[in-house]
Each structure stands twice: as structure tokens, then as C-alpha cells.
């Protein structure tokens, strides 16, 4: 007879809560909202240029300023989050409200007012409204993993599902938009393409919102949001206090914000157009190759989750970051020594090597993402242990504030870089010729910036105290404090 493997609760001596698999999958469908909108908003620079006549430089400034606004609204939402308690719950109300706000703004930005003679003011106002809706949806979703489970083995599993969806959704959207829709609209970014892309995105996001609401329904009740101390109204000083004293959160901000800045610069539509359309010379095939290399790499996330469940979130972030740095450096050398146009030739050795390198790169990046998902939930529990208050929106909002202030420069870096290449009044198109300046700019933005971000990650994580062993102690202390608080509550009731 085989012995039953002991659970994490039995091993650690802590009664962990666990979510059902279908609930985790429904939560992961939040990617249908976030990543489909992410794919669409990545084309905001094209909408601004085509639909509103805004210059490249002005677009970069607008997107940077609105991104900073996005960061400021994140901690402010914590106050709303703290006060929303309806008979329909907290999470579901905020998720649906956020979707409706951003859907109206995106429809106006890409369809309703686009190419109707409107200008900079209209575009900017619509973008601001979008930011408010996006913040409401995204910030609420970020608090859910810590609410669903605190089992150290299951948290990385939740990360696997979210990672898989976060990569699959933009891949599918990219295929639909660039391989199916773009050729039907003449092969260039125009108003017809932007309108159709917006309509598809809003339908996908609506489905995702409903599925997430279904997944969190059993957790969306008042007792879920109770801490280990008497609840007090949230104040702005609480946000400052969290940022000042939550060391794991400080480390996470430094590591993840730098990584995300590089990721967002490289994922801008204009950078992908340069790499796939101008350097490789076949944007449709380039998109297909990206999907081919991405799908198998999702299985790496399962390996990453198992590793993180065994060794902890911090160790997962550090080790997989080192692997990603090596693979990305090899990718740069590969582009330098070959003729990149050969990648665009179906079945060529260059194409096969590119797919394999992309597979390894995407796989290691997925393992980092899985580790990060688990780490953020750990940071929320660390704060509960440290301060006695269960304030997931404050922790995630504080992170998002600093994160978005840093990553707000992604759009201006990308648009500023292509402006240096001569694209001051227009945007790069797949049919443009490749020059040495374009090639090296793409290498720096697509591969160089991520390497710099990972170096910052390794430096930040050296001072992080949140090891696997420490997280077990954190959960034990939380359980003891909650039991003591409950006992004190019953004593007060009897008096």
C-alpha cells in the first residue's frame, strides 16, 4: 500500500484554507479582462495618431501622465475597497463596476469618438476614465489570491493558472488581431481595424468578468476581510506605514517594477511591429512563431509552481531570474550573428532556433510570474502578521502606486525611441525598411532592458526576509493571533 502524502497543513502544523480547482480557474479567467484590454490599450498610440491626429511625441507624454495617474488612483481605491460592503458582496460589485467604466471609455476611445474630428483633449479624457475603470478591476483582482488560499503548495498552483491565462489570452488576441483581422483591414493599422479590435476585446472582457465573479462568490462575504485586531477606518497614513515597514513589499516593488517596465516597453505595439514586421520581415509569421514558442512553455509554469511550493517564492524568483538572463543574452547574440530575415522563412534553421530560444525564454519568464503571484499573497499575509490588519488592497495598492510611477515611462521610452529613429509624425509600419539604427534600438528595448531589470531583481531579493521557513512561521503566528482575537471577542460578549 502506498502512503498518503502528508498535506502542507500536516507538515507545517497550520490549518491552511484551500480553494477548489474550478474556483481557481474562474479567477484565472481575469486574464480575459486584463490581458485582452492590455492587448487593445497597447495600440492606444495608433488610435491617438489615426483617430485623433496626435503626434508621436505628444502620445508618449499623454500615456506617461495617465500612467502616473493610474498609479495614484491605486492606493486611493484601497479606501473605496475598505468601505464597500453590500448585500451583493465587495469583490463582485467592484469587478463589475470597474469593467463597465473601462468598457465605456475604451469604446469611446477606439470607436465612438475616433476619426470623428476630435482631438487631444477628448482622447486624454477618455484615457483618464479608462484608467479609473482599469484600476478598479485590476486592484480588486490583485487581492483575490490571498483571499482564496494561504496553502504554500496551492498558492503557486494558482499562479500556474493565472500565468497560463495571462500568456494564452494575449497570444490568442495577437493571432486574432494581427493574423486574422489586420489582413482583412488592408494590412495596416487603420480606423476599421481599431473599431473591430475594440469590439472583440470588450466581448472577451465581459465574459472574463462574469467568470471571475462566479469563482469568488463563496469568498465574497464580510467575515473574509477580518484581521487579528479591531477594525479601524483606513487612513492615508496607513499606506505610508505599510510602504515604510513592510520589507518584503519593498523588495517586491524594486524587483517587479523594474521587470515590468522592461516588459511593457518591449510589448508596445510599435516595438513588436519593428521586430516582427521590419527586422524579421514577416509580422504575420512572427506572430505565429511567438504563439508556437509560447504554448509549450506554459508547461514550464507547472514546474515553476512545484519548485516554488517546495522552496518558497523568494528562491523561485531568484533562480528563475538567473536562468532568464542567460537565455536572453543568448537570444541577442543569435540576432547579431544571423540574418534576421531568415527567421521569417518557414522551416529555415534560423526560424527553428528562434522558436526554441523563445520557448526557453518564455518558459523561464512564466516561472518568474508564477513565483511573483505567490510572493504578493505572501506579502499580504506578512502585513497581517506584522500589523494585525487584513488590508490586501492597501498592500497591493501601495505596490501598484510605486510600480506604475516607474512603469509609466514605458510608453514614452518606446515612442521616444522610435522618434529618435525618425518616426516623429507617423508610426512604424511592417513594410518599412530595416536599418542598423532600427535593429540596435529593437535589441536594446526588447532584450537589453529586461536584463537590466533582472539585475535589479537579484540585488533587491538579497535583503528579502521572506524565506520558505519564515512564511510557515508567519502563518502560525496569524493563526494564533486570530484564535486569541476570537477568544477575546467571546469574552466581551459574555460580559
Please provide the spans of the model-predicted regions:
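Membrane-embedded alpha-helical bundles of multi-pass transporters/translocases
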Residues: 2-495
Amino acid at each position: 500500500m502506498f502512503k498518503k502524502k502528508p498535506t502542507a497543513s500536516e507538515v507545517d502544523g497550520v490549518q491552511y484554507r484551500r480553494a477548489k480547482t474550478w474556483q481557481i480557474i474562474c479567477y484565472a479567467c481575469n486574464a480575459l479582462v486584463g490581458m485582452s484590454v492590455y492587448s487593445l490599450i497597447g495600440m492606444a498610440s495608433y488610435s491617438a495618431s489615426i483617430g485623433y491626429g496626435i503626434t508621436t511625441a505628444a502620445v508618449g507624454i499623454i500615456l506617461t501622465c495617465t500612467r502616473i495617474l493610474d498609479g495614484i488612483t491605486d492606493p486611493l481605491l484601497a479606501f473605496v475597497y475598505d468601505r464597500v460592503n453590500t448585500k451583493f458582496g465587495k469583490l463582485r460589485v467592484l469587478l463589475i463596476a470597474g469593467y463597465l467604466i473601462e468598457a465605456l471609455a475604451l469604446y469611446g476611445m477606439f470607436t465612438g469618438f475616433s476619426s470623428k474630428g476630435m482631438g487631444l483633449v477628448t482622447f486624454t479624457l477618455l484615457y483618464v476614465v479608462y484608467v479609473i475603470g482599469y484600476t478598479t478591476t485590476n486592484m480588486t483582482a490583485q487581492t483575490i489570491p490571498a483571499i482564496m488560499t494561504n496553502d504554500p503548495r496551492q498558492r503557486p498552483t494558482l499562479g500556474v493558472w493565472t500565468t497560463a491565462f495571462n500568456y494564452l489570452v494575449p497570444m490568442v488576441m495577437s493571432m486574432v488581431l494581427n493574423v486574422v483581422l489586420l489582413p482583412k483591414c488592408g494590412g495596416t493599422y487603420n480606423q476599421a481595424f481599431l473599431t473591430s479590435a475594440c469590439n472583440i476585446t470588450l466581448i472577451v472582457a465581459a465574459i472574463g468578468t462574469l467568470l471571475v465573479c462566479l469563482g469568488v462568490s463563496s469568498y465574497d462575504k464580510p467575515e473574509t476581510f477580518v484581521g487579528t485586531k479591531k477594525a479601524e477606518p483606513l487612513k492615508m497614513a496607513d499606506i505610508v506605514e505599510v510602504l515604510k515597514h513592510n520589507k518584503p513589499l519593498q523588495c517586491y516593488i524594486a524587483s517587479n517594477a523594474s521587470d515590468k517596465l522592461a516588459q511593457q516597453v518591449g510589448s508596445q505595439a510599435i516595438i513588436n511591429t519593428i521586430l516582427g514586421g521590419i527586422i524579421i520581415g514577416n509580422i504575420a509569421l512572427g506572430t505565429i512563431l511567438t504563439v508556437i514558442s509560447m504554448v509549450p512553455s506554459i508547461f514550464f509554469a507547472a514546474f515553476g509552481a512545484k519548485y516554488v511550493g517546495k522552496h518558497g517564492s523568494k528562491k523561485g524568483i531568484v533562480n528563475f531570474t538567473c536562468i532568464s538572463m542567460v537565455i536572453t543574452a543568448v537570444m541577442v547574440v543569435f540576432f547579431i550573428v544571423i540574418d534576421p530575415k531568415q527567421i521569417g522563412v518557414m522551416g529555415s534553421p534560423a526560424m527553428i532556433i528562434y522558436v526554441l530560444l523563445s520557448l526557453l525564454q518564455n518558459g523561464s519568464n512564466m516561472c518568474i510570474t508564477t513565483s511573483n503571484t505567490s510572493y504578493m499573497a505572501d506579502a499580504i499575509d506578512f502585513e497581517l502578521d506584522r500589523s494585525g490588519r487584513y488590508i490586501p488592497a492597501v498592500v497591493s495598492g501601495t505596490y501598484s502606486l510605486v510600480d506604475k510611477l516607474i512603469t509609466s515611462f514605458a510608453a514614452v521610452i518606446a515612442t521616444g525611441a522610435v522618434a529618435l529613429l525618425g518616426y516623429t509624425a507617423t508610426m512604424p509600419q511592417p513594410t518599412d525598411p530595416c536599418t542598423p539604427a532600427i535593429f540596435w534600438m529593437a535589441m536594446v528595448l526588447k532584450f537589453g532592458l529586461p536584463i537590466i531589470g533582472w539585475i535589479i531583481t537579484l540585488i533587491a531579493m538579497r535583503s528579502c526576509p521572506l524565506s520558505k521557513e519564515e512564511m510557515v512561521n508567519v502563518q502560525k503566528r496569524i493563526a494564533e493571533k486570530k484564535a486569541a482575537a476570537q477568544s477575546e471577542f467571546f469574552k466581551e460578549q459574555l460580559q
